[in-house]
A protein has these predicted regions:
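Glycine/Thr-rich beta-alpha phosphate-binding loop at enzyme active sites
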Residues: 1-39, 74-85, 92
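Ferredoxin-type iron-sulfur electron-transfer modules and their immediate structural context
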Residues: 14, 78, 82, 92-244, ...
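Glycine-rich beta-to-alpha transition loops that act as phosphate-gripper elements at the mouths
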Residues: 41-54, 318-319
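Glycine-rich phosphate-binding active-site loops on the catalytic face of alpha/beta enzymes
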Residues: 56-83
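Flanking helices and flexible, charged tails adjoining ferredoxin-like Fe-S electron-transfer domains
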Residues: 137-139, 146-152, 221-223, 227-245, ...
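Beta1-alpha1 glycine-rich phosphate/pyrophosphate-binding loop at the start
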Residues: 169-179, 187, 216, 220-224, ...
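Conserved beta-strand-loop-beta-strand element in the redox core of flavoprotein oxidoreductases
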Residues: 318-335, 445-477
Length: 790
């Protein structure tokens, strides 16, 4: 295939195609060959075979079937069991008793000739495979589940969906309770981190789904839709009970998602909270700019009322100028600036002030508030983000069957910043995208829009954001007929009561340069997503709570699922197809009815059951290693003291540097003798790290151990370590652990690993850290009974 990715160097013209994408091509090559030879060839097949298509391949008379790509994915060799199960189920379904009779019955052939029946099956399958959505690019969610999180030596397990969610939503836990049918518990889990479950259950951009581990198996979980199901099932739940009033007051400027989020967490902890909103309603851009076919008024009102019922006061129609801002600072202990980005960007081209040119915020607000905006039958939407998609789909519903709506974008669809889901909905509804079109001028006649001139573009070199920059094609100017132009190229924050320099915030706490004044959401980020705004509100609230000497625990819940590591691994070796996004038929999308319907109970539970609970056990690197070089071992969770020896006039005093906390019993190491450093574990590890490099690396022989600058070797009751070429040793004897380094020997307690005594050798250092000794003690104790200890 043509090298169009960033994996191989640019000078490489071609790249290797394998797996799923290759399957329809290869099965058609097999069909062509068998047609030429009347089905008499013996064909060995290896091209995207998996547990689901194996029965069809066997029915085509093709064998042996060899597998590579599928077994290099999470689940690894454990996936093979499902191959046999699916094949056995297919044979039983045909009531066949061997492969030959299966081929005959699958073909529904009365000829009783296996060779002829197999060829018939192959022709049919080859014809159907290219149109099977399982082999289309759109069926894959995202490119990788890797995140920016570092990979530590110990305690690396964290579900990538949680780490990707700006609100830190404990997704695996509410999946677990949903699958069990305990919707009350699922709701409680959601509300620990997310005060807007109804809103985010409908319109969250759900980046968590792009990092769902299931994406490497079949399809990501419908996380957002399950949240929506749980929110709806708990619509009448009584409010949480806040802590008693703590005497602290907080003023929040803006009743959008960020302000509402902060108010929720603060109210729970007993703060007196008042929100000051410029509009006559709460919700900010959520209530004013998202079309009702995506977000219902009921969902918004439900979340807002829940927060108000905690004692939060919302004052509407409030103009905040410098004087009022100073009053808020004086009358409250803390102020949170949480305004949205409510100014639409302009293109700066001729004709932009003509009648018929509308910005997307005004247009979407007019429609949402039922002000019935007047637009022409031909509408051009300029932009490629989610707001542009919303504006285009809304305009389509207004112009009717006789109108035409087109999106004008200066790059290609592949570079659009809009969510893939939103782009797909746009295309499904029949809206055309004019790619590589840069607006130059809005044609005006009689003061009104009469069309638009666009420069045709082509993609050039990549810019800092990774997208290829559009460059003009000389002389290629085209006319785009339209009577209405809706600009959707971005939004600005309009903030006149505080200076830009004062708005600079601490990236951790959210505090501005003004003491006890915080800012977050669009006010700091610029126009961004709802869930990021919610996350900012949560973060600021927690920091205000901490400043006030309080504490609110919103961390993930620890749930005992009654499964051991082996059972988690078995679950993670099975592919389970998910349900498709439950959208209503395109023919029914003429009005503003909700496009994505609610999941029913059976759908929600079935989908939630697909969760792999990778916040409990991950072991992806273990399963994807074809050489079995990544190895699972177990430690004793607990708090361990990292100690150091301080030389005081020739005598050593033991002090504690810090505490090393291990919370996870399942850990991973790498066996260097087995590892060829192929990097497959790096590809699928949800962190930014390389398991074969970052995990403790053990060697099985003294020879291989001594060849490495950084390594471990366990043999009997001795563990050796090499760090940058220097060798250390830990030995178990006399009911203790003895640590040996050149200048320092020490005796460690066998259970707590605390230093009992030190024995300096030679020149006494001023200080000596026993951090490596502690790590070696943990590793030795955990591995002394391992199979590779000899």
């Amino acid at each position: 295939a043509v090298n169009h990715k960033d994996i191989f160097p640019p000078n490489e013209k071609m790249m290797y195609m394998s797996g799923r994408a290759l399957h329809p091509i290869s099965i058609n090559v097999a069909a062509k060959l068998q047609n030429e030879f009347n089905g008499k060839l013996d064909i060995s097949f290896s091209a995207g075979a998996d547990c689901f298509n194996l029965p069809k391949i066997i029915a085509c008379g093709i064998k042996p079937v060899t597998v590579c790509s599928d077994l290099l994915k999470p689940g690894g060799y454990g996936r093979q069991l499902q191959y046999l199960e699916e094949l056995a189920a297919a044979i039983r379904a045909e009531k066949a008793d061997n492969i030959d009779s299966f081929i005959l019955k699958f073909a529904e052939c009365s000829c009783n000739k296996v060779e002829k029946a197999a060829l018939l099956n192959l022709r049919r399958y080859a014809g159907a495979a290219p149109t099977n959505s399982a082999y289309h690019k759109e069926s894959k969610t995202g490119e990788s589940i890797k995140t920016s999180r570092a990979l530590p030596e110990f305690d690396c397990v964290r579900a990538p969906c949680i780490g990707t969610c700006p609100a830190g939503q404990d997704i695996p836990s509410y999946m677990y309770y949903t699958a069990k049918g305990d919707y009350k518990k699922a709701y409680e889990v959601i509300m620990r981190q997310n005060p807007l479950p109804s809103v985010l259950g409908m319109v969250c951009d759900h980046q968590c789904q792009h990092k769902c581990t299931r994406a490497n198996y079949d399809s990501s979980l419908l996380i957002r839709e399950i949240k929506r199901f749980i929110a709806n099932r708990n619509a009448d739940r009584p409010n949480l009970k806040p802590e008693k009033a703590n005497g602290k007051k907080v003023a929040i400027v803006g009743a959008g998602p960020s302000g509402l989020s902060a108010a929720y967490f603060l109210a729970l902890e007993g703060f007196a909270v008042e929100i000051f909103e410029t509009k006559a309603f709460a919700g900010g851009m959520v209530s004013d700019a998202i079309p009702s076919f995506r977000l219902t008024a009921d969902a918004i009102n439900r979340d807002v009322e829940y927060i108000k019922n905690l004692g939060v006061k919302i004052s509407y129609d409030q103009k905040i100028d410098r004087q009022r801002f100073d009053e808020l600072r004086r009358d409250n202990d803390y102020v949170y600036i949480a305004i949205g980005a409510q100014g639409a960007k302009k293109m700066g081209i001729p004709g932009e002030d003509a009648a018929g040119v509308i910005d997307q915020l005004v247009f979407l607000s007019d429609v949402r508030q039922e002000r019935n905006p007047k637009i022409g039958p031909n509408v051009a939407i300029i932009g490629g983000g989610n707001s542009a998609m919303d504006a285009a789909r809304t305009a389509l519903r207004l112009v009717g069957d006789s109108g035409r709506v087109r999106v004008v974008y200066r790059r290609t669809r592949a570079e659009m910043p809009a969510d893939l889901e939103e782009v797909k909905a746009l295309l499904d509804e029949g809206i055309e995208v004019l790619e590589l079109h840069q607006p130059l001028e809005i044609v005006v006649a009689g003061g009104k829009v009469a069309g638009m001139k666009c420069q045709k573009m082509q993609l050039g070199e990549k810019g800092p954001d990774g997208r290829r920059k559009p460059v003009p094609i000389k002389g290629a100017i085209v006319d785009v007929p339209c009577e209405t132009v809706i600009e959707a190229i971005g939004q600005d924050v309009i903030l006149d009561f505080i200076g830009a320099s004062d708005l600079e915030t601490d990236p951790v706490t959210g505090m501005t340069r003004i003491r006890n004044v915080f800012a977050g959401g669009d006010a700091v980020r610029g126009a961004s997503t709802i869930v990021k705004a919610v996350g900012d509100g949560q973060r600021v609230a927690l920091n205000i709570i901490a400043q006030a000497g309080k504490e609110l625990d919103i961390g993930p819940a620890a749930i005992k699922k009654g499964m051991n590591a082996a059972q988690f691994m078995v679950k993670s070796a099975r592919r389970v197809k998910g349900i498709k996004l439950p959208e209503i038929d395109v023919k029914l999308r003429k009005g503003f009815a909700t496009v994505i319907r609610d999941l029913n109970e059976a759908e929600a539970r079935k989908e939630a059951e697909r969760c792999l609970y990778c916040n409990d056990v991950c072991n992806v690197c273990v399963s994807v290693c074809p050489n079995r070089a990544n190895f699972t071992y177990y430690v004793r969770p607990g708090d361990y003291l990292v100690q150091k020896a301080i030389n005081k006039k020739g005598k050593f005093r033991i002090e504690t540097e810090r505490t090393m906390r291990l919370t996870q019993d399942v850990q991973v190491l790498n066996i260097g003798d087995f590892c060829n450093e192929c990097g497959n574990c790096t590809t699928f590890c949800p962190t930014a790290g390389d398991p074969y490099k970052n995990k403790p690396k053990f060697y099985l022989t003294d020879h291989s151990f001594k060849e490495e600058a950084n390594a471990f070797r366990i043999s009997g009751k001795v563990l050796k370590a090499r760090v940058d070429g220097h060798e250390y040793m830990l030995e178990e004897k006399d009911d203790a652990l003895h640590y040996h380094d050149g200048p320092m020997h020490a005796r460690l307690h066998r259970d707590s690993f605390e230093v009992i005594a030190v024995e300096p050798r030679g020149e006494k250092p001023a200080a000596y850290s026993f951090e490596l000794a502690l790590k070696m003690a943990i590793l030795y104790t955990s591995l002394k009974n391992a199979a590779f200890n000899h």
